[in-house]
């Protein structure tokens, strides 16, 4: 009987605790939604993305380059000078990310890095650019030499 009463009391306590926390969670969720809505209201179309061809080779040294893929993919290959911060961890490790210099973030294709970049922008980083097409397109376009290749390309008639 004591076990049943103890379980019932524990369940009641848990239920009351969750009920009391629900309003605070709802307020936090509403605040987060308001913050995202405010960001989306004023962000430039395409302002957060950059193509590999738009980055001159010398500019990489002036940026913090974040590889948002997992550690195994980063170990296999990455943009020279990049640091590995998995896309889910950018806010948890935001103290490592400067606000006073350009930040380039990429993943394999650009989709996960776009989420990480969005989170950083909403959190106050207005210096973040997402590498359009990710690491795969960066490699396909010539890597560090993508800008030079694009500048030297002749239009086909």
Identify the role of each PLM range.
Residues 2-7, 11, 22-53, 60-63, ...:
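Rhodanese-like catalytic fold shared by cysteine-dependent sulfurtransferases
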Residues 15-21:
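Residues within alpha-helical transmembrane segments of multi-pass membrane proteins, especially transporters
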Residues 66:
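Active-site flanking residues adjacent to catalytic metal/cofactor-binding acidic residues
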Residues 106-107:
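Short, surface-exposed ligand- or partner-binding patches at beta-edge/loop junctions that are enriched
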